[in-house]
């Protein structure tokens, strides 16, 4: 599991097929870590 604590980190180069990643994003006006599956857009 790879988590980044910044919304500005480019994870597109580090993700792999089926890899579990986390991204720091704004949801409902709150910055937080959210789990995603696979590569980021």
From Swiss-Prot:
One of its GO terms (molecular function) is toxin activity. It is found in: Secreted. GO terms for cellular component: extracellular region. InterPro entries: Snake_toxin-like_sf, Toxin_cobra-type. Keywords: Disulfide bond, Secreted, Toxin. SUPFAM superfamilies: Snake toxin-like. Disulfide bonds join 3-22, 15-39. Pfam families: Toxin_cobra-type. Its main location: secreted. It comes from the Eukaryota. Expressed by the venom gland. Belongs to the three-finger toxin family. Short-chain subfamily. This is Maticotoxin A. It comes from Calliophis bivirgatus (Blue Malaysian coral snake).
């Amino acid at each position: 599991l790879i988590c980044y604590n910044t919304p500005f980190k480019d994870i597109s180069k580090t993700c792999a097929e089926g890899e579990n990643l986390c991204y720091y994003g704004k949801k409902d006006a709150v910055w937080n870590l959210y789990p995603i599956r696979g590569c980021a857009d």
